[in-house]
């Protein structure tokens, strides 16, 4: 079978569809272009959407660690008054509260999420402890002690209509936005989980440069017109 793409090295910017895993998109791309050397600059949870930076070919995948360390920007929605075990909409509900925070209380609590903060990775995450991913322990009902990590964040409240709290956030590598929503809910005394998440920027690559990830499902789709170099220029 003739492959749809002739140019097989470069950076492909994808707007990840909701409900798809990041690795399912990588597998689809591998099948589409016949190149096994494909990396990324950060995954997204299945419920999340937005910028995924795909690195195609050895020349580009070797710099994945550099791109992984770049800052990211998100638009997010927290659901107040309810908590889940995974801190997001895919988890099991473990608590509810009738408290309705005021906008002033929310603004005051949000000031904590400015600059350098300490964060503990959620149990439902791919962070490894003793050689196992945390979600492997969580699925067995186990809670493992996790080390705090230091991250840089800048959070801005953009809209509030209870129970939904919209915010934007710029953050450093390794920041769990689910944990931000969870911690904010705890500070407000009502609990919260992350309802929606959209990555708007990864390093210098933005959402308006991305193609719809669903296009990768088309067997004759040619990605070559959309491949970029490290500076974001078209190849």
From Swiss-Prot:
Active site per the UniProt annotation: 45
Domain of life: Bacteria
GO molecular function list: RNA binding; tRNA pseudouridine(55) synthase activity
Keywords linked to the UniProt accession: Isomerase, tRNA processing
GO biological process: one example: mRNA pseudouridine synthesis
Catalytic activity annotation: uridine(55) in tRNA = pseudouridine(55) in tRNA
InterPro entries (alphabetical): PsdUridine_synth_cat_dom_sf, PsdUridine_synth_N, tRNA_psdUridine_synth_TruB, TruB_C
EC number: 5.4.99.25
Claim: Ribonucleoprotein is one of the keywords in the record: no
Protein task: Responsible for synthesis of pseudouridine from uracil-55 in the psi GC loop of transfer RNAs.
Record family assignment: Belongs to the pseudouridine synthase TruB family. Type 1 subfamily.
This protein's name: tRNA pseudouridine synthase B
Gene that this sequence comes from: truB
């Amino acid at each position: 079978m003739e492959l749809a793409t002739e140019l097989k090295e470069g950076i492909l910017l994808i707007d990840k569809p909701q409900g798809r895993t990041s690795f399912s998109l990588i597998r689809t791309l591998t099948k589409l272009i016949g190149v096994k050397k494909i990396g990324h600059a950060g995954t997204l949870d299945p419920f999340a959407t937005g910028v995924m930076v795909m690195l195609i070919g050895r020349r580009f995948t070797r710099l994945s660690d550099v791109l992984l360390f770049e800052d990211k920007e998100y638009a997010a929605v927290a659901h107040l008054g309810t908590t889940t075990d995974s801190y997001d909409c895919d988890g099991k509900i473990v608590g509810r509260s009738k408290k309705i925070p005021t906008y002033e209380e929310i603004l005051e609590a949000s000031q904590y999420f400015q600059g350098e903060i300490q964060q503990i990775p959620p149990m439902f995450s791919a962070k490894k402890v003793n050689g196992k991913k945390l979600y492997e322990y969580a699925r067995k009902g186990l809670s493992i002690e996790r080390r705090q990590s230091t991250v840089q964040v800048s959070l801005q409240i953009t809209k509030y209509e209870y129970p939904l709290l919209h915010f934007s956030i710029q953050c450093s590598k390794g920041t769990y936005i689910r944990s931000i929503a969870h911690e904010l809910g705890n500070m407000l005394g009502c609990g919260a989980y992350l309802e929606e998440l959209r990555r708007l920027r990864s390093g210098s690559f933005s959402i308006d440069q991305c193609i719809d990830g669903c296009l990768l499902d088309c067997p004759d789709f040619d990605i070559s017109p959309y491949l970029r170099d490290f500076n974001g220029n078209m190849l």
